[in-house]
């Protein structure tokens, strides 16, 4: 089961989130049938979104839009405070071969664009914040967003590793943030440790990557675990929700779907689930719309 562990240094100067998102990203790959580069790009976005949502409380939802001008197109993800995330990538078929070190290229196929975060506090007034893409690798873009938009210096590592058949082998990451009151000496020590830590890929490949990530982040500094929560790919779409959307269409358009198309099918962008509305279904919706 996927999970996120929240921790804090004993000094109270740093906090870190570490995540195992393997099943989450594997489910996304299966639902969208993404090829290698698209899988990694979508997976990194889902991981970043789960970190952002873990910072929220109540019934808040966080939408992340990675908007590029290259092969991937847009990547859209939505996460809630209960550990659920869903998402999709416009171009599922980017399949660029791995580099000599086994890494899958992402940045060149994201291109120029923006990292957009929309936080819905369930009050009817969502808050939107936008920062430019720095590298298109998503992890660096996420760290830049945290530092620039949320004014919190952060180190981030996100990745998705694939097996020889380009299926998800492991996915996860971390976020480390400086908290108010951290001394210059502490900041320098953590900066040095992050600069010298093994690559996120090598840490994810270790037998227990959650423990490896925590050890790499904190080193000899003491820390305590604050919480451990489950994570999952989950889409809240339903036939009823799409029926409500159809109700917003005009009677003329609904009648055309019934008479000319003999029904309609709608596919959810976030999970690829398809819903079918027969002529009888549409007749009922038409009758409901004119009541």
Swiss-Prot record:
GO terms for biological process: protein refolding. Keywords: Chaperone, Cytoplasm, Disulfide bond, Redox-active center, Zinc. Gene3D superfamilies: Hsp33 domain, HSP33 redox switch-like. Its main location: cytoplasm. GO terms for cellular component: cytoplasm. GO terms for molecular function: protein folding chaperone; unfolded protein binding. It is found in: Cytoplasm. Disulfide bonds join 235-237, 268-271. Under oxidizing conditions two disulfide bonds are formed involving the reactive cysteines. Under reducing conditions zinc is bound to the reactive cysteines and the protein is inactive. Pfam families: HSP33 (PF01430). InterPro entries: Heat_shock_Hsp33, Heat_shock_Hsp33_C, Heat_shock_Hsp33_N. Redox regulated molecular chaperone. Protects both thermally unfolding and oxidatively damaged proteins from irreversible aggregation. Plays an important role in the bacterial defense system toward oxidative stress. Belongs to the HSP33 family. This is 33 kDa chaperonin. It comes from Streptococcus agalactiae serotype V (strain ATCC BAA-611 / 2603 V/R). The gene is hslO.
